[in-house]
Structures are given as structure tokens and as C-alpha cells.
């Protein structure tokens, strides 16, 4: 049946909608507001005190001889205590050190002290700075790089969904068919002793990859249970599916109207709900979902950080942060439970909280800070809710052939929010998957720039899937960065080509090559929990642009491994206004480092996704070791 299209859409994924995030608030109420940590100044000062120019190598000749004739540490002996990281000096040598510093891209050795990089360069120069008592770590031919930065994602939402059964398709999960989904949901009931708060919960199923090639419905979930409510999130997080017991519990029936900005899908030719709740209709389910405790969420956050560290990530992002998420992350920082740094970009509905100082904007932090604000201007292409200038290749059921997705806010509202951010000196991100949404954001930036004058604002187009060449030209003039969700080429490339955008537009998604050709800075991200925050997949996807079926999508937009590394190191740090302390291996910067068994620049491009992470180091301390 046909559905009226609302003028503006409120999508249901963490990167494009208030709806799922309202669910998160319901999941952990009562979290008190925590201030940012102000501790750590002494550690930083200690590191900075060691800086100052490179000393003459001749003056340290004896130290050089003594230091580099000492026995090397074995790979298994590289884990250091907090005391060693804070007070000792450690020298790494004996491998490939890719600094990501364009003026000195390779180094022979790196010295680390007080959580900072003391020196990087030749063995002789580094040994002179480090002195005879420095600890030596032999890289044994491995490769050291700056720690990876996944500069757009939703780490708090990722933690929440860790408590759901994984319904993702391979390689992120075990699902190939609807029968697999049923089996996994039954496993959830078994391992939780009957469900969580009576509910059976799963997330990240993707109907475009199911053997049955159809959407999940209440009938499928009724096979899991007729007595307990069952809920499954779609991979886009724009849709949930519930069973008959859940519909009854939620009071959703044939008489229930579609809520504003959402759709209750019905069985063909009837008004009877089929269990699929889209966009704004998701909010009908949220108040009845079980709530996670503060301690449960902290434990889940610990687990997520361990995964990030195992992927070489030392800085992550919490995009579209809500107040409960801010409180959770602040609490984690206060309890010293952040292994990695987290930069938050509160949802635009919290502009007033920021203006009042209820949520503090600051550049300095101890593990957690607020970096700016995030606007949501459209939805997602895989769910066909991204706002495009031309119709979808295959329109969703119930919409006319000119369907192009939805805007979230009107032009005046978008311009007003950007103007407010400029006036207050806040960095602004905007979620723009569709080129129409990008047009809206670029126009708002242009208008605000004319009013407030040029400046180093680093406004960023998040996802940037369908940016046109003329838009890149305009962005370059305005100093606007794109941050590409480049793994779309693998996860949904075939879907985009065959159903979402058509062959021509699909070949141009994530146009990183022409971005580089313009001399623009850019970043690459995974948008977790939409896909796992594995930066190796970012490298592999950007370099190969290969779909699940093995087809190359837009060969002309392939980039080199070195260029891809920029997008998760120095340029990603630049996006966060942190390129002065992160993103490259240079004296004075944080000792955020990753060691890999292979050199990503030298291995065959197809092996990038299998790059072996040997060790991840955060502020001089090992947080992961294989």
C-alpha cells in the first residue's frame, strides 16, 4: 500500500536520527552529569619538559654506542607499566617506521617518554636524545605507524548494541538466511536465561544479503517466540522488526495510524501490521525496551574499547552524542575506564545545552572531550532514505518513481544552526549521504562564511557518499572537509549499483581520488555500529573498491595505501583539531602508536584487510598486544 511521504524525515540510525538515540536514553536513565577530567596536566607537562630541539649527535656519541649495543627486548617483553610509560624512556628501532609526517615520512628509531614522543629520526639522533638508560624495543622487521583514528562513529551506541545478539551478515556476523536469524535469536534467549527484561533482542540483520532476498516480518519472529516480545534492528538502524507478542505489548494494531515521520508497514491489501517499523515508528517500541544499568553499560564500553584497541585504534568518536551518552563517557573518564580517547559531537538538539555550558565545549581533555556539534540532514542510501537530487534506481514499495529520499530539516533551519555554530566558534559536522543534503549544508556554510568571514573551522561533511565534483570544488573553496564512509563499496556496493543508485552514480560513491587531486584533506571512517570499526577494512576498501561480489566499483577512485593511511592518521587528527598532538610520529606528540606485522604500503593491496595488528600503544602504554 502507498504511504504519504512526510515533508521531512527523522531517520532511525545513530548517525541520522533522534529515534534510535531516544532508545538509548531509555536504556540507561539516571546517569548523572560528570565533569571532564582536569587531571593529567602533570603528565603532559613532564612530556613537554623533555622537548626542545634536537641536540648535536656528536655530544651524545658515547650514549649512542652504549645504547645501541645493549640487548634488544623480545617482542613479548614490550608491555610496559604505567610507571615506565610515565617516567622511563623507550626506544623503538629495527623495523619500518612510517611517521605520516610528509617532511620526514620514514624514521629509523622513535623514543617515547612520559606518554609523548621524545624524538623520531635516525638511530644516532634518537639515541643521543634517549641516553644510555633507555629501554630498547626491537621491532624485528615489523612496521610502526601513528595510532589509527576512527574519526566518525558512535562508540556509546556500539556499546549498547553489544548487549544484543549479532544478526549481521558475513564477515561481521554469522547470518546468511532468515533461518540463521531465528537460530541466533534463540541463542540469545538461552544465554540470557529467557531474554533481557523478557525481550529477545538482535541487531544488524541485512535483508539485501539474505538468501531469501526479502524483508524480515513478524511471521518470521513469531517462529522464535509467540509468547515473548522479539525485536531485531536492521543493519541501517532505520528499521526494526517485531513479532506479534511485541505488537500486542506495544498496542500497535490495524487501527494504529502511522506516526509523524514514520511508517508502520502493513500486510498487502490490509491495515494489519506486518511487524516492520520504519523511521519515526521505531519510537513506538522504545519506551517498552529493557533498560541497561550504568555498570552494565560501563562493562560493555570496556569490551568495545578492547575491540577498538585490537584494531589499532587509539582515538574514536561518539557522533550525535545525547546527554546520557555524555554522562556515560564522562563517568568512564572519571573512573579511568577509557583505554582510548573519545571525541564527542553532540546531536544538534543539544545546542542549547552547549550554549548554557551544561555540556562543555573544550579542546583539552583526559580521554574524553566535546569537539563540536553534529547536524543530521538526511538518512542512509542502503535504507533508501538518503536525500538525493535524482530518483533512486529502484524506489521502495509504496513510493512514486520520483522518490529521492527525505530532508530532515528545511534550508532555513540548517542555515540557522550553522550560523549559530560559527558565531560561537564551534566546529560543525553534518551527516550528508545524499548530494541534496550536501547541497543544503554547503549552502549553509557559504552563507555563514560570508557573514562571519573566513576562518579555520574545519566543517566536515560526514559520509559524503554521493558528493558531486562541483560540490567538491565548492567545499575546497570554503575549506570544508569530507569524511568518507568508504567501506560502503564493500558492504553495499552491489546493492548501490543494482538498486540504490544505478551503475554510474554507484561508481562515484566516496570520491576520494578526486578529493586528493584537488589537494583537499579528507578522512575515512566506519560509522560503527553500522559496520565494525576495523580500520584495516577502511584501508582495503579505499585501495581496492571491491564489492562483496568481487566487482570493482569506480576503479578511477582507487587510492594508494599511503593515501588511505592519511585518512585514518594525520588528516583524521586534523579533522578533530588534534593534528598538533596526534596523527603523526613527531617529537612532542602523544605516543599513540600501532605496530603491525606487515607494512601496509608494501603488501599486496588485497591483503590489507588481513593486516596483523601486533601491538597498540596509547600515550606510551600498551593497550593491546597479540
Where are these regions (language model features)?
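N-terminal secretory signal peptides
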Residues: 1-35
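N-terminal secretory signal peptides and thylakoid transit peptides that target proteins
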Residues: 23-44, 51-60
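C-terminal segment of N-terminal export signals and the immediately downstream linker at the start
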Residues: 30, 50-101
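Divalent metal-binding segments
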Residues: 82-93, 98, 102-356, 375-437, ...
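Acidic (Asp/Glu)-rich catalytic clusters
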Residues: 335, 361-364, 476
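Phosphate/diphosphate-binding loops
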Residues: 341-369, 458-464, 503-517
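Non-cysteine beta-strand/loop elements that form the S-adenosyl-L-methionine
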Residues: 368-384, 480-489
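His/Asp/Glu-enriched, well-ordered alpha-helical/loop segment
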Residues: 418-429, 436-459, 463-464, 469-473, ...
Amino acid at each position: 500500500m502507498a504511504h504519504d511521504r512526510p515533508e521531512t524525515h527523522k531517520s532511525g540510525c545513530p548517525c541520522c536520527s533522534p529515534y534510535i538515540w531516544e532508545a538509548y536514553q531509555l536504556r540507561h536513565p539516571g546517569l548523572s552529569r560528570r565533569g571532564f577530567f582536569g587531571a593529567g596536566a602533570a603528565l603532559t607537562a613532564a612530556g613537554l619538559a623533555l622537548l626542545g630541539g634536537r641536540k648535536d649527535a656528536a655530544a651524545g656519541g658515547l650514549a649512542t654506542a652504549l645504547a645501541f649495543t645493549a640487548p634488544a627486548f623480545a617482542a613479548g617483553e614490550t608491555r610496559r607499566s604505567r610507571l615506565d610509560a610515565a617516567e622511563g624512556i623507550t626506544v623503538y628501532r629495527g623495523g619500518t617506521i612510517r611517521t605520516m609526517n610528509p617532511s620526514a615520512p620514514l624514521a629509523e628509531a622513535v623514543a617515547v617518554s612520559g606518554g609523548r614522543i621524545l624524538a623520531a629520526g635516525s638511530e644516532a639522533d634518537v639515541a643521543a636524545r634517549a641516553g644510555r638508560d633507555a629501554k630498547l624495543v626491537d621491532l624485528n622487521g615489523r612496521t610502526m605507524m601513528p595510532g589509527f583514528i576512527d574519526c566518525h562513529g558512535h562508540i556509546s551506541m556500539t556499546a549498547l548494541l553489544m548487549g544484543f545478539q549479532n544478526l549481521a551478515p558475513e564477515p561481521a556476523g554469522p547470518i546468511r538466511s532468515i533461518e540463521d536469524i531465528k537460530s541466533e535469536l534463540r541463542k540469545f534467549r538461552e544465554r540470557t536465561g529467557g531474554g533481557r527484561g523478557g525481550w529477545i533482542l538482535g541487531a544488524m540483520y541485512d535483508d539485501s544479503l539474505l538468501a531469501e532476498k526479502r524483508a524480515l516480518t513478524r511471521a518470521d519472529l513469531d517462529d522464535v517466540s509467540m509468547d515473548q516480545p522479539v525485536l531485531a534492528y536492521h543493519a541501517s538502524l532505520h528499521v526494526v522488526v517485531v513479532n506479534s507478542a511485541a505488537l500486542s505489548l506495544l498496542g500497535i494494531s490495524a487501527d494504529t495510524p502511522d506516526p509523524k515521520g514514520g511508517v508502520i508497514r502493513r500486510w498487502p491489501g490490509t491495515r494489519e501490521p506486518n511487524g516492520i517499523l520504519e523511521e519515526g515508528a521505531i519510537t513506538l517500541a522504545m519506551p517498552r525496551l529493557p533498560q541497561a544499568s550504568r555498570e552494565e553499560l560501563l562493562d560493555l564500553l570496556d569490551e568495545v574499547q578492547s575491540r577498538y584497541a585490537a584494531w589499532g585504534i587509539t582515538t574514536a568518536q561518539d557522533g550525535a552524542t545525547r546527554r546520557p551518552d555524555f554522562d556515560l563517557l564522562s563517568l568512564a573518564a572519571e573512573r579511568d575506564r577509557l583505554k582510548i580517547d573519545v571525541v564527542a559531537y553532540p546531536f544538534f538538539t543539544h545546542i542549547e545545552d552547549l550554549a548554557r555550558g551544561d555540556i562543555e565545549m573544550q579542546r583539552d581533555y583526559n580521554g574524553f572531550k566535546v569537539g563540536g556539534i553534529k547536524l543530521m540532514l538526511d538518512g542512509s542510501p542502503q535504507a533508501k532514505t538518503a536525500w538525493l537530487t535524482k530518483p533512486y534506481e529502484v524506489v521502495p514499495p509504496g513510493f512514486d518513481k520520483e522518490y529521492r529520499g527525505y530532508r530532515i530539516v528545511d534550508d532555513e533551519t540548517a542555515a540557522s544552526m550553522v550560523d549559530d555554530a560559527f558565531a560561537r566558534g564551534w566546529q560543525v559536522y553534518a551527516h550528508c549521504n545524499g548530494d541534496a543534503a550536501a547541497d543544503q549544508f554547503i549552502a549553509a556554510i557559504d552563507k555563514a562564511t560570508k557573514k562571519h568571514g573566513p576562518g579555520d573551522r574545519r566543517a566536515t561533511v560526514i559520509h559524503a557518499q554521493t558528493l558531486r565534483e562541483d560540490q567538491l570544488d565548492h567545499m575546497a573553496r570554503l575549506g570544508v572537509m569530507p569524511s568518507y564512509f568508504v567501506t560502503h563499496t564493500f558492504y553495499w556496493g552491489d546493492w548501490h549499483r543494482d538498486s540504490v543508485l544505478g551503475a554510474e552514480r554507484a561508481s562515484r560513491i566516496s570520491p576520494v581520488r578526486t578529493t586528493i587531486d584537488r589537494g583537499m584533506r579528507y578522512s575515512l571512517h566506519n560509522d560503527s555500529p553500522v559496520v565494525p570499526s576495523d580500520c584495516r577494512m577502511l584501508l582495503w576498501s579505499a585501495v581496492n573498491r571491491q564489492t562483496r561480489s568481487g566487482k570493482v566499483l569506480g576503479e578511477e577512485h582507487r587510492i594508494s595505501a599511503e593515501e588511505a593511511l592519511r585518512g585514518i592518521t594525520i588528516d583524521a587528527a586534523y579533522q578533530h583539531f588534534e593534528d598538533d598532538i596526534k596523527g603523526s610520529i613527531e617529537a612532542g606528540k602523544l605516543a599513540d602508536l600501532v605496530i603491525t606485522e606487515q607494512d601496509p604500503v608494501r603488501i599486496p593491496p588485497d591483503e590489507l584487510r588481513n593486516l596483523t595488528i601486533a601491538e597498540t600503544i596509547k600515550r606510551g602504554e600498551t593497550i593491546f598486544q597479540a
